[in-house]
Swiss-Prot record:
It comes from Clostridioides difficile (strain 630). Its main location: cytoplasm. This is Threonine--tRNA ligase. Homodimer. The keyword Kinase does not apply. It comes from the Bacteria. One of its GO terms (molecular function) is tRNA binding. Catalyzes the attachment of threonine to tRNA(Thr) in a two-step reaction: L-threonine is first activated by ATP to form Thr-AMP and then transferred to the acceptor end of tRNA(Thr). Also edits incorrectly charged L-seryl-tRNA(Thr). Belongs to the class-II aminoacyl-tRNA synthetase family. It is found in: Cytoplasm. Coiled coil: none annotated. Residues 242-532 are annotated as: Catalytic. Binds 1 zinc ion per subunit. CDD domains: TGS_ThrRS (cd01667), ThrRS_anticodon (cd00860), ThrRS_core (cd00771).
Length: 639
């Protein structure tokens, strides 16, 4: 009997070898209709995969990550088949699934335009309707080369030539179309009904600018048209909220041509950034943290001690000073360790919470840069907590609660991911097991659900990642808690224990915002530029109806300014309707309109960005109301 262990813990038994699809059918016909892929003992396979020995089996639907990857990989093959039907002279390169879709790189003299994409998309839908069976077959390397040479697929020939001579090469065939591929794929083309080709861009073969520029066609696909339409609507909304667009319109930041990847914050952007840092410092002071500022440039010896020189050097900017190697810090961790070693410590000092808003620099390829989301220089809100082994759980819980409070202030929901040991790591198996268990047990005691991300920990320890969910349902990895049992040894951190002997402390690395710049980019898109009052660069704009009310407008401005409210006065000789529209476009939370009646009654006419006309009230009353709103840090998301 073949025993198949399912995800829910149940065991199915079969007398003979059986396909994954038939296992699904044995559970229910409904499941068989919806399943798109599976994993056998952790390896993702197609539904035609034959099970002939005991195994663990997970069945994936489209909504599962693995299911989407297989579905969209098949979509890429359908795209390639459609291209070959319409442009037989095209040569195919590669076509993987990617986050939210797929692409295929092609070599074609004809420059594709949007109208061409519509034709290709229509052909893809036709192929889906044909319900072509997708079959895998394998060939020895020499026969695989012959096949691709016969088809004139030069790029496939190059890929196969790079493989060992003993390699068995797999292909997938659908109708009269065959493509080199590792797989797996759907059983047929019929499920890929909801498809959209989105754009075409240039891409060098194998990412090398010395190679030929190919055309990369991007697309996405879903099981249902309704889901595709919802996704395309989400993309349109995301375009409106793009932080690069809004950052320019609202005068928050710029990326100068002279410094790609090095953002420059403008006056209004600095108001926003400083408000975030003020909030961060307030929260951390209350939680018992002390703040330091470590040097931006440190010598090679330090980075060798930390391990960065061996594990992270390709991401670091290096410089020669007095004929010695130095590096601009890519992380703040070593600075915290230098601070720790600057004085002697007793067990009574713990836990010792050291925070830093440190400027870091990391080398990113120009093609990876994206506004504030991917930069070469940013401020990271690092903290390093030194503690006794018995304090680990409580400190992890404390950090998790602190980060939870920060995210709730902005209206974010989040999910947690526990990342385990990567291949390129420091330390023994026992140390990694202890560190991973410490994080796992803390999360379980807090009752926080989490998923495991195998092999994605830092090289010096496992970590908990916080993935924020914004108002569009997108997720962003921001906060991190890393338990480190390696660097305290590398830096010879010690303390005197109760026994009078030297001991090694345990250390937690943690961030809440992560990159401040990236977090600001997320906030811009999350709020669509309509920041809550406490965060808004300009909280109030005073709009006098005409010049003769300018004196009163200036008095109002002074009173607001003296109360710490960020206020601007529009003193231009423009009509009031124009001023209101401009302030609304600038997304200022409150507009105070002053005219003859307001001067006479010593009032202000209040207009809210989000609620419209509020009416005429006493200035003191307005100041009390907005001050309360600022102090409470209300963060209501407005549509």
């Amino acid at each position: 009997m073949i025993k198949v262990a399912l995800k829910d813990g149940s065991i199915k038994e079969f007398e003979n070898a059986i396909s994954v699809m038939d296992v699904a059918k044995s559970i229910s016909e409904g499941l068989a209709r919806n399943v798109v892929a599976a994993s056998v003992n952790g390896e993702v396979v197609g539904l035609d995969h034959i099970i002939d020995t005991d195994c663990d089996l997970n069945l994936f639907k489209f909504e599962d990550k693995e299911g989407k990857e297989v579905f969209r990989h098949t979509s890429a093959h359908i795209l390639a088949q459609a291209i070959k039907r319409l442009y037989p002279e095209a040569k195919l390169a590669i076509g993987p699934s990617i986050e939210n879709g797929f692409y295929y790189d092609i070599d074609l003299d004809h420059r594709l335009v949007p109208e061409d994409l519509e034709k290709i998309e229509a052909e893809m839908k036709k192929i889906a309707k044909e319900d072509l069976k997708i079959e895998r077959f394998e060939l020895p390397r020499n026969e695989a080369l012959e096949l691709m040479k016969e088809q004139g697929e030069d790029y496939k020939v190059e890929l196969i030539s790079d493989l060992p001579e003993s390699e068995i090469i797999s292909f997938y065939k659908q109708g009269d179309f065959t493509d080199l591929c590792r797989g797996p794929h759907l059983p047929s083309t019929k499920k890929v009904k909801a498809v959209k080709l989105q754009s075409v861009a240039g891409a060098y073969w194998r990412g090398d600018e010395n190679n030929k520029m190919l055309q990369r066609i991007y697309g996405t696909s879903f099981e249902k048209n309704k889901d595709l339409e919802e996704y395309l609507h989400l993309l349109e909304e995301a375009k409106k909220r793009d932080h690069r667009k809004l950052g320019k319109e609202l005068g928050l930041f710029m990326i100068p041509e002279e410094g790609p990847g090095f953002p420059m914050f403008l006056p209004k952007g600095m108001e926003l950034k400083n408000e975030l840092l003020k909030f961060w410092r307030e929260i951390h002071r209350k939680a018992g943290y002390i703040e330091i500022e470590s040097p931006i440039i440190l010598n090679r010896k330090l980075w060798e001690t930390s391990g960065h020189w061996y594990h992270y050097k390709e991401n670091m900017y290096t410089v020669k000073i007095d004929d010695e190697d130095y590096a601009i810090k890519p992380m703040n961790c070593p600075g915290g360790l230098i601070y720790y070693n600057s004085q002697l410590h007793s067990y009574r000092d713990f836990p010792m919470r050291v925070a830093e808003l440190g400027r870091v620099h990391r080398h990113e390829l120009s093609g990876a840069l994206q506004g504030l989301m991917r930069v070469r220089a940013f401020t990271q809100d690092d903290s390093h907590i030194f503690m006794l082994p018995e304090q680990i759980k409580d400190e992890i819980k404390g950090v998790a609660n602190l980060i939870d409070g920060i995210y709730k202030t902005f209206g974010f929901e989040y999910n947690l991911e526990l990342s385990t040991r990567p291949e390129n790591s420091m330390g023994s198996d026992e140390e990694w097991e202890a560190a991973e268990n410490g994080l796992r047990e803390a999360l379980e005691e807090l009752g926080l659900p989490y998923t495991i991300n195998e092999g994605d920990g830092a090289f010096y320890g496992p970590k908990i990642d916080f993935h924020l969910k914004d108002c569009l349902g997108r997720t962003w990895q921001c906060g991190t808690i890393q338990l480190d049992m390696q660097l305290p040894r590398q830096f010879d951190n010690t303390y005197i224990g109760q026994d009078g002997e030297k001991h090694r402390p345990v250390m937690i690395h943690r961030v809440a915002f992560g990159s401040i710049e990236r977090f600001i980019g997320i906030l811009i898109e999350h709020y669509a530029g309509k920041f809550p009052v406490w965060l808004s660069p300009t909280q109030v704009k005073i709009l006098p109806i005409s010049d003769k009310f300018m004196d009163y407008a200036n008095e109002v401005k002074k009173e607001l300014f003296d109360k710490g409210i960020r206020v601007e006065l529009d003193d231009r000789a423009e009509k009031i309707g124009f001023k209101i529209r401009e302030a609304q476009l600038e997304k200022v939370p409150y507009m105070l309109i002053v005219g003859e009646k307001e001067v006479a009654d010593n009032n202000v006419s209040v207009r809210s960005r989000d609620k419209g006309e509020i009416g005429s009230i006493k200035l003191d009353e307005f100041i009390a109301s907005i001050s309360k709103e600022i102090e409470s840090r209300e963060s209501i998301i407005q549509d």
